[in-house]
């Protein structure tokens, strides 16, 4: 009998991280690898943010904070939501976390009992199902289709809800698809939540990276909602680990208790840097967003030219989710072939659910020169295979 718990054994690995590890092995062996597999901004964190962190450390902000987070940061977040979304968020309903992933644990830990279900897209970010499974819940996937912009059909979401359903998980802009849910989509999902009594769990980590319209938060449409967000993507702060959960009032104290026991609090000086990010770094966010958009406009047609199918162009985030079945049905095997034979690292679509099989995710968190080199290598590989 294995000494490892069944709970740990059941957690699915991030397959893309295995691709990352192999890419690094090849680089250490002297290979030049075009890295298009990971969602990590290639920009440095804006200097105004790093200076704020340095100043906070020099001022002694190296100790514990309240588990809910620094009041200054929570108040800055309420101001941001008021100015950017015209939504009033009570600072008391915000829990600051060490990245958005811990916020997900707080959310599902406060919401789910064993056997409870969460409706989510297929394909979607794989951690959602892993968190739900780990806590004894049941993911309930609903297929979304490239031909429909990877957006939910409301009637299929409604049909997936039963007496054990606690939440509908959404992610807009989305990973891996770059899909953005419009006002009509969000209104329809909010109406389902109000009708059925479930909550919406909205992962909004890619807000600030929408190329076709304004950011929309689910809080504009219903208060039966949890919001997951953070600083990693738009502010180029993945390594800083700073996120937050906005929760309905009844769930704040339960989430706080989980935070106290699992994480205690986010780093003090990083929270101070977060305040400055919200107040002073928006021009940097817009500069990076504009550059990502240029890359998006290059990469989509370039991938089409070498034989990949893109029915739904990304409207947000920094990913292109391309149908690669012309090159092979098995996306994992194809990703490894492209890495070993072409020197290009990609994320296999199967990592994001059965609905992603046959697809590859390309990150454009790399400069245009590297994107062009990756496309050149892939085109050569496709022509010679």
For the regions a protein language model found, what residue spans apply to each?
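Short, contiguous pre-domain boundary segments
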Residues: 1-7
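PLP-dependent class I/II
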Residues: 4, 14, 19-33, 40-56, ...
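A glycine-/small-polar-enriched, mobile loop at the entrance of the PLP active site in fold-type I
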Residues: 37-41, 55-74, 83-84
């Amino acid at each position: 009998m294995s000494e490892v718990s069944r709970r740990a054994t059941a957690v699915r690995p991030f397959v893309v991280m295995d691709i990352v590890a192999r890419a690094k092995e090849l680089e250490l062996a002297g290979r030049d690898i075009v890295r298009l597999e990971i969602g990590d901004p290639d920009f440095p964190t804006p200097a105004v943010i790093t200076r704020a962190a340095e100043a906070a450390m020099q001022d002694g902000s190296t100790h514990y904070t309240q588990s809910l987070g620094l009041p200054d940061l929570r108040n800055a977040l309420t101001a941001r939501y008021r100015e950017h979304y015209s939504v009033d968020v009570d600072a008391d309903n915000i829990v600051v976390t060490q990245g958005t992933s811990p916020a997900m644990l707080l959310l599902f830990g406060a919401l789910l009992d064993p056997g409870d279900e969460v409706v989510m897209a297929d394909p979607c970010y794989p951690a959602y199902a892993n968190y739900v499974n780990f806590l004894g819940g049941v993911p309930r996937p609903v297929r979304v289709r490239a031909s429909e912009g990877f957006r939910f059909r409301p009637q299929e979401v409604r049909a997936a809800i039963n007496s054990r359903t606690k939440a509908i998980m959404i992610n807009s802009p989305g990973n891996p698809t770059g899909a953005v849910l419009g006002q009509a989509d969000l209104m329809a999902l909010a109406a389902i939540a109000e009708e059925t009594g479930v909550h919406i769990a909205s992962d909004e980590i890619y807000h600030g990276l929408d190329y076709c319209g304004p950011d929309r938060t689910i809080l504009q449409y219903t208060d039966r909602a949890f919001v997951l967000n953070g600083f990693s993507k738009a502010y180029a702060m993945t390594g800083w680990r700073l996120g937050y959960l906005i929760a309905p009032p009844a769930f704040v104290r339960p989430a706080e208790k989980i935070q106290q026991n699992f994480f205690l609090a986010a780093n003090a000086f990083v929270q101070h840097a977060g305040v400055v990010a919200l107040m002073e770094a928006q021009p940097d966010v817009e500069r990076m967003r504009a550059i990502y958009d240029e890359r998006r406009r290059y990469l989509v047609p370039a991938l089409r030219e070498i034989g990949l199918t893109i029915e739904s162009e990304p409207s947000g985030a920094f990913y292109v989710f391309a149908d690669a079945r012309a090159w092979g049905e098995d996306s994992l095997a194809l990703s490894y072939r492209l890495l070993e034979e072409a020197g290009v690292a990609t994320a296999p679509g199967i990592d994001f659910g059965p609905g992603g099989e046959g697809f590859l995710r390309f990150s454009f968190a790399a400069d245009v020169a590297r994107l062009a080199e990756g496309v050149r290598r892939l085109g050569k590989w496709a022509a010679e295979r």
